[in-house]
């Protein structure tokens, strides 16, 4: 999201989302919130993230309240970004990924460049990328010939259909 310097709307409010409930990520969330606050951004924690990390000094908000914010910041790895994209797509709020995972192919900001990247984004120097999502539906034949829907989900870049235990990277 920070690659090219296209003047966009400056960021005044942001919510931090993470599904990685580990102590180093908790410190990163506090650090990101502190840096954003110093840059004049009102920072919130997504309600589930707030419960998972127990950071009472940052106000928590619900998913519905996120709709009115300027930015969603996902702290974690590629899996966190993919999960957030899938569950928050209907909010129509830009998502910025900050890498705290292993690969970081889908995250926009590396922790080593955090200060400079946040300054640029807050000032409005970022570009937006629309990503295609796949609506995946699985159905099975039924006696009346009409397929019975047994599963449905959105996917950002791929979907896997398997019958058994799935291997993870």
Please give the residue ranges for each predicted region.
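N-terminal glycine-/serine-/threonine-rich phosphate-binding loop
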Residues: 2-75, 79-89
């Amino acid at each position: 999201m920070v690659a090219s310097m296209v003047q966009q709307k400056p960021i005044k409010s942001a919510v931090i989302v993470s599904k990685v409930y580990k102590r180093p990520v908790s410190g990163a969330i506090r650090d990101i919130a502190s840096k954003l606050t110093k840059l004049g951004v009102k920072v919130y924690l997504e309600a589930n993230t707030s419960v998972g990390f127990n950071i009472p000094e940052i106000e928590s908000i619900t998913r519905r309240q996120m709709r009115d914010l300027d930015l969603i910041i996902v702290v974690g790895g590629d899996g966190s970004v993919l999960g957030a994209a899938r569950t928050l797509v209907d909010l129509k709020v830009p998502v910025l990924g900050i890498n705290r995972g292993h690969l970081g192919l889908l995250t926009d900001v590396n922790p080593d460049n955090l200060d400079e990247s946040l300054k640029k984004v807050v000032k409005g120097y970022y570009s937006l990328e629309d990503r295609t999502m796949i609506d995946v539906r699985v159905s099975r034949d039924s006696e009346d010939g009409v397929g019975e829907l047994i599963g449905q989900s959105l996917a950002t870049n791929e979907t896997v259909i398997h019958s058994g235990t799935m291997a993870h990277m």
